[in-house]
Amino acid sequence: CNIFSPVMESHQKNGTANGKILYYISENFRYPKDFDSLVYVSQVLQGIAIKAGVDHWRANRGRCMGALYWQLNDNWPVASWASIDYFGRWKALHYMAARFFAPKAGYIYTEGTKAVISAANETLENQSLNVTVRIRDVELNVLFEETVETTVKAQSSIHVLERDFADVIGSKKRRVFAEAVYTWQDGTTSTEAESFVPYK
């Protein structure tokens, strides 16, 4: 199989889309070794892209009051951008959406050596929250750790911590990542992680 084969291109309704997919794969990942890997990585990339948008919109509650993505499912067997295929199987985006659309969610945004750790509470009650923020290296050693206790008001989002980690990261930017463990008052936990460089 080949993404540029006549059969694959007949399913692609945007003439420049396959090139864009390959471009963004090359910006973020190493090039996949075969067609199956290419399909898989393109689905992971789709999930990461949609997550980035949703996280941004949730962090800007008040300016943006909701988000939907196109499209949920397929009505016939086809190669598509749907998050659930015709047979009801979840693709990477749908697994990711179940987490990033959770009523109580956390997210990390990185730029350079800076990280913004945020939380959203879409419930109708204020929620107390503990967030343990760590900078880890690829061997999982903890280089930095801080726990923040806060409350996220009902139907709101907050920045829990904003910090430039240049002093922690030093010259190891490609070998470290930010991690945030969110523990809500009802015991619900989730972990978010984000690198400071593209995944490749």
Model-predicted regions and their roles:
Residues 106-108, 131-133, 178:
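Generic structural motif
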Residues 34-36, 55, 74, 85, ...:
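Acidic-enriched, low-complexity/disordered segments with a strong bias for Aspartate over Glutamate
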Residues 125, 141, 186-188:
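Residue-level signal for secondary-structure boundary sites
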Residues 119-121, 135, 182:
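Hydrophobic beta-strand positions in extracellular immunoglobulin-like domains
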Residues 129, 159, 164-200:
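Terminal connector regions
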Residues 1-127:
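Substrate-binding clefts and catalytic carboxylate motifs of secreted carbohydrate-active enzymes
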Residues 131-174:
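Intrinsically disordered, low-complexity Pro/Gly/Ser/Thr-rich segments with frequent PxxP/GP/PP motifs
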